[in-house]
Structure formats: structure tokens, C-alpha cells
Curated annotation (Swiss-Prot):
Annotated spans, Disordered: 26-51
Organism (species): Homo sapiens
Alphabetized PANTHER family for the sequence: ATP SYNTHASE F1 SUBUNIT EPSILON
Protein's name according to its UniProt entry: ATPase inhibitor, mitochondrial
Predominant location: mitochondrion
Modified residues (N6-succinyllysine): 103
Notes concerning its domains: Forms an alpha-helical dimer with monomers associated via an antiparallel alpha-helical coiled coil composed of residues 74-106, leaving each N-terminal inhibitory region (residues 26-52) accessible for interaction with an F1 catalytic domain. The inhibitory N-terminal region (residues 26-52) binds the alpha(ADP-bound)-beta(ADP-bound) (ATP5F1A-ATP5F1B) interface of F1-ATPase, and also contact the central gamma subunit (ATP5F1C).
Source organism phylogeny: Eukaryota, Metazoa, Chordata, Craniata, Vertebrata
Family named by the database record: Belongs to the ATPase inhibitor family.
């Protein structure tokens, strides 16, 4: 029976420690909510400047890619609309020819 009580105390002790650790980690995280990925930049120094330069380079590259994609999209739209204009002009000519043929038959 003494062994069982000792085992129970040990088991509860381990879980008690685990519970306290979990609570401790949880409170640490909630206290540091305002700190985030930008903490290196906020610290300043060489690492902060490097991080800022890398972020700016990344966003400039993203902007270039977006502008290139937008330009390509607009160029494709222009080509599509030109083809549509040509198709409609051919259809107009075809209808004019039909009208001409109908007038000729009268």
C-alpha cells in the first residue's frame, strides 16, 4: 500500500509540475503578445537594418512581379479585343453581302 501511495504522489507530482509548466508557458505567451516577428527590427543594430533591407527588397520584388503580371494581363486583353473586333467586322461584312444578295435577287 505504501508503494501505491508513493506512486500516486509521484504521479500527481509529475502532473502537477506539468500543469504549472503549461500555465507558466501560457502566461509567458500572453504577456509577450505585442512582441512578434518584428522584434529583431525593433532591436535596431546591424540585424535590424539588414532585416529592414530584406523586407524592402522582398516587397519591391513582389511589386515588380505584380506589375509585370498586370501588364501581361492587359496586353492579353488588348489582343483578345482586337481579335473580337476583327471577327465582328467580318460578320458585318458577311451580313452586308447577304443584304446585297437579297437586293440583287429582287
Amino acid at each position: 500500500m505504501a508503494v501505491t501511495a508513493l506512486a500516486a504522489r509521484t504521479w500527481l507530482g509529475v502532473w502537477g509540475v506539468r500543469t504549472m509548466q503549461a500555465r507558466g508557458f501560457g502566461s509567458d505567451q500572453s504577456e509577450n503578445v505585442d512582441r512578434g516577428a518584428g522584434s529583431i527590427r525593433e532591436a535596431g543594430g546591424a540585424f535590424g537594418k539588414r532585416e529592414q533591407a530584406e523586407e524592402e527588397r522582398y516587397f519591391r520584388a513582389q511589386s515588380r512581379e505584380q506589375l509585370a503580371a498586370l501588364k501581361k494581363h492587359h496586353e492579353e486583353e488588348i489582343v483578345h479585343h482586337k481579335k473580337e473586333i476583327e471577327r465582328l467586322q467580318k460578320e458585318i461584312e458577311r451580313h452586308k453581302q447577304k443584304i446585297k444578295m437579297l437586293k440583287h435577287d429582287d
